[in-house]
Amino acid sequence: MKAFFALVLLAIAAPALAGRTLDRCSLAREMADLGVPRDQLDKWTCIAQHESDYRTWVVGPANSDGSNDYGIFQINDLYWCQADGRFSYNECGLSCNALLTDDITNSVRCAQKVLSQQGWSAWAVWHYCSGWLPSIDECF
């Protein structure tokens, strides 16, 4: 009986632990609500599409330097967030696990910091997003 209840609790908690998948418009609206300039939203949604397919819970495979990328914007753990048991410059001052939650606030704030320090080209997928992009106007 205890095992049954444990399974029920796990089943209830699993969606919360798994993160969530957004779509282009829901991401644009949430980022706008967090104060991201509207003229940047098409670029951010493009980056999120190509980096994580809008999934908040993604941890990328190891990079050539052994680092990993986290969350909807695939933020690197060598420079921007603290992974368990590994050195990091942790410029965003947060755990990498904070980038994997349903609440995208930490991911957005950290991504904005990356942008302010390194520009859009900090994302390897930027070449997909640097030209014409579909308008996000229909999202609002």
Curated annotation (Swiss-Prot):
Pfam families tied to this protein: Lys
Major enzyme class: hydrolase
Chemical reaction(s) catalysed: Hydrolysis of (1->4)-beta-linkages between N-acetylmuramic acid and N-acetyl-D-glucosamine residues in a peptidoglycan and between N-acetyl-D-glucosamine residues in chitodextrins
E.C. code: 3.2.1.17
Family matches, as CDD domains: LYZ_C_invert
Active site: 51, 69
Function: Unlikely to play an active role in the humoral immune defense. May have a function in the digestion of bacteria in the food.
Protein name, as recorded: Lysozyme S
UniProt organism field: Drosophila melanogaster (Fruit fly)
